[in-house]
Amino acid sequence: MSKKKVMVGMSGGIDSSVTAYMLQNEGYEVEGIYLKLHNRTDGYHEKNLGYIEDVAKFLNIKYYILDLADKFSKEVYDYFVDSYLTGTTPNPCVKCNRQIKFGAMLDFAKQHGASYLATGHYAKTDGKFFYEADDKTKDQSYFLSQVDKDALKYMMFPLSTYKKEDIVKFGAKLDVAYKKITEKSESQEICFVETVYTDVVKKHANIDQEGDVLDENGKVVGKHKGFAHYTIGKRRGFTVKGAQEPHFVTKLNPKDNTIVVGKKEALEVNEVVGNNLNMFIDDTKFSCNVKLRYRSVSTPCEVQIKDEKAYITLKEPVYGVAKGQLAVFYHEEKVIGSAWIESTK
């Protein structure tokens, strides 16, 4: 008896291409989905679809092109731009995973008879929780922590126990269709940002307006090139008169286009409040480790959930925590929930 149908989110990259091969090799009926999330005119989609076409021919599978550009624009792109214009630091990949990949794409897969949706993410799931991947340098559990818990039972991550370098080596030997993919450059971290984030924001607002740099007492100590060019913890791109040691951005004030700077100790954070929780456990008070940005070291903390907010008390200080980023709660390698950072002190 043949195994169930799995749809694979295919990007034209090596991870999703090997994922499709692995699942077919295990006996699943495999079909692909390519997400068209924006209307780039630089050949981006054409290149990706060329790679997917070659892989689909090798595997003898069909694939769909799912145009979610409008939904992506409203729910991810606009949020990204608005965040920088309101002085917070966005995480578009987290939004995309919840709303687009494991929201709309999962709905599409189920409507087309798939029992599962697989992707080339480096993470693990048992249908109830996410866990860190074995390759900690590529682990993407942080970005998945806002996905609706009802979606987990449909999700598969075949690469969860592999190292990225092994997937690349494996793909290069598999077929010429895969070898071509391994020879192209890695895709950029945020698919719609071709160079730097400010190039995207500049399309929607004049962010190149000089403003005052303030010290922690509100005194003008220098100039900057426009608040949207800065994020919390940044130490370059502004002047501080008479400074003998590095100064860091500690606060952004969009209303009057000022930024506040201070020495490293001014970035110290001991408490965090988070909103828009996505919890995989029911406890309202617990100890765990928290990651306050991707690729950061996790920090031991106490968490209390009250009035739909997470009150996080860190057991050791963390420096440079930005509003708008995600606090992800871990128990060892298991993701037990997450919350968007609203305030710090």
Swiss-Prot record:
EC number per UniProt: 2.8.1.13
Chain spans, region Interaction with tRNA: 138-140, 293-294
Catalytic activity reported: S-sulfanyl-L-cysteinyl-[protein] + uridine(34) in tRNA + AH2 + ATP = 2-thiouridine(34) in tRNA + L-cysteinyl-[protein] + A + AMP + diphosphate + H(+)
Domain of life of the native organism: Bacteria
InterPro entries per UniProt: MnmA-like (IPR004506), MnmA-like_C (IPR046885), MnmA-like_central (IPR046884), MnmA-like_central_sf (IPR023382), Rossmann-like_a/b/a_fold (IPR014729)
Primary location recorded for the protein, binned into one broad class: cytoplasm
Disulfide bond residue pairs: C96-C191
One GO molecular-function entry: tRNA binding
Biological processes per GO annotation: tRNA wobble position uridine thiolation
Top-level class of the enzyme under EC nomenclature: transferase
Short name of any one Pfam family annotated for the protein: tRNA_Me_trans_C
CDD domains cross-referenced by the UniProt entry: MnmA_TRMU-like
Active site: C96, C191
UniProt keywords, alphabetically: ATP-binding, Cytoplasm, Disulfide bond, Nucleotide-binding, RNA-binding, Transferase, tRNA processing, tRNA-binding
Family: Belongs to the MnmA/TRMU family.
NCBIfam families recorded: PRK00143.1, trmU
Role noted for this protein: Catalyzes the 2-thiolation of uridine at the wobble position (U34) of tRNA, leading to the formation of s(2)U34.
Protein name (database record): tRNA-specific 2-thiouridylase MnmA 1
Source organism of this protein record: Aliarcobacter butzleri (strain RM4018) (Arcobacter butzleri)
Source species taxonomy: Bacteria, Pseudomonadati, Campylobacterota, Epsilonproteobacteria, Campylobacterales
Gene: mnmA1
